[in-house]
């Protein structure tokens, strides 16, 4: 199966970011695979890119919460890599869940 990039942009997902003096791109996909297995996201240090699938496997859009969770999951893989640790899936998943909850529940005095 072949990865399919999308032309869509999401206002809550950056196109680039810099951490640890490394600039990473974020690419959004209609379809994303690893050895023919569908993926929600992928961190690639060699290419310095995070790839995010923004559609369900049936072609319908994923929710903002699911996309953010996937983005944070892959971002935490980048943190782990730069911290010189293995890509622990459970750690990245836990941090992504906590970050999503933080982002969706925070309230400011002006709101």
What are these regions (language model features)?
Residues 1-15:
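Short acidic, Pro/Gly- and aromatic-enriched capping/linker segments at domain boundaries
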Residues 1-4, 105-111:
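Short intrinsically disordered terminal tails
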Residues 3-6, 29-31, 71:
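A short linear-motif detector with a strong N-terminal bias
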Residues 66-74:
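Short alpha-helical catalytic segment bearing the HExxH-like zincin motif
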Residues 94, 98, 103-108:
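Acidic/histidine-enriched, beta-strand-rich ligand/metal-binding domains
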């Amino acid at each position: 199966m072949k990865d399919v990039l999308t032309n869509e942009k999401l206002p809550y997902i950056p196109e680039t970011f810099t951490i640890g003096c490394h600039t990473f791109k974020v690419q959004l996909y209609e379809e994303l695979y690893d050895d023919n297995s569908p993926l929600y996201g992928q961190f690639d240090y060699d290419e310095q890119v995070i790839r995010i699938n923004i559609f369900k496997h049936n072609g319908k859009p994923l929710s903002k919460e699911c996309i953010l969770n996937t983005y944070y999951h892959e971002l935490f893989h980048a943190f782990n890599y730069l911290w010189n640790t293995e890509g622990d899936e459970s750690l990245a998943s836990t941090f992504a869940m906590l970050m999503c909850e933080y982002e969706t529940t925070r309230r400011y005095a002006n709101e």
